[in-house]
Amino acid sequence: MMKSENDGYDYDGKIRDIDIADEMKNGFLDYAMSVIVSRAIPDVRDGLKPVHRRIIYAMWDLKMTYEKQHKKSARIVGEVIGKYHPHGDTAVYEAMVRMAQDFSYRYPLIDGHGNFGSMDGDPPAAMRYTEAKMSKIAGEIIKDIEKETTIFIDNYDGSEEEPTFLPGYFPNLLVNGASGIAVGMATNIPPHNLNEVIDGVIAVTKNPEITTVELMKIIKGPDFPTG
């Protein structure tokens, strides 16, 4: 079987010499970018990591919007791992639980029904017992997704399509914040008040040259869910 150049072989099967420093650099960068893009760091356009985006998109596809009834969390997790996120169900459910906790998210993206844990560290009930649907504000993140507002790519096995980002009618990255540790990169953004952020966006739109000091008069500081 022919080997590619990245395998350290020529196409005729002969071993070729490579510079170990270059190979380490290229390999590390490829791995780092894979972790950054595919797992650990949120996209600035919608403020979501892939697992969170896939949860919201799967719920939207299942018609589990705010005005509809709650459905079993296990149904959602199965949809996510079966179509978009080929990883363990535990990781998906943990992300989903956090999205429903009003002490973890300033503006929860999931409306949970049942035991979703507590501030004191009590664990949530198993996914077969809890139910969920999209929160009202989550509908604003995915609103108009069917109107060519995003770019779709094939899922992991090419059987479905998924969005690379959600349209986002508000800056979720600033509103709900984000944290993540990747390879060679990390982020930790606190949440902010929605009204203040929108006022700040309007101010920047009206005056692109606005200073940080002027903007801080509008957005005075973080707004954590626990006060």
From Swiss-Prot:
Q: From what superkingdom does this record's organism come?
A: Bacteria
Catalyses: ATP-dependent breakage, passage and rejoining of double-stranded DNA
**Assembly, per entry:** Heterotetramer, composed of two GyrA and two GyrB chains. In the heterotetramer, GyrA contains the active site tyrosine that forms a transient covalent intermediate with DNA, while GyrB binds cofactors and catalyzes ATP hydrolysis.
| Family statement drawn from the similarity comment of this UniProt entry | Belongs to the type II topoisomerase GyrA/ParC subunit family.
- Additional comment: Few gyrases are as efficient as E.coli at forming negative supercoils. Not all organisms have 2 type II topoisomerases; in organisms with a single type II topoisomerase this enzyme also has to decatenate newly replicated chromosomes.
- According to the record, the segments passing through the membrane are none
What Gene Ontology terms describe where this protein resides (cellular component)?
cytoplasm; DNA topoisomerase type II (double strand cut, ATP-hydrolyzing) complex
The Topo IIA-type catalytic domain extends over: 41-227
Give the E.C. number(s).
5.6.2.2
The protein here is known as DNA gyrase subunit A
Q: What is the lineage of its organism?
A: Bacteria, Bacillati, Mycoplasmatota, Mollicutes, Entomoplasmatales
What gene name does this entry carry? gyrA
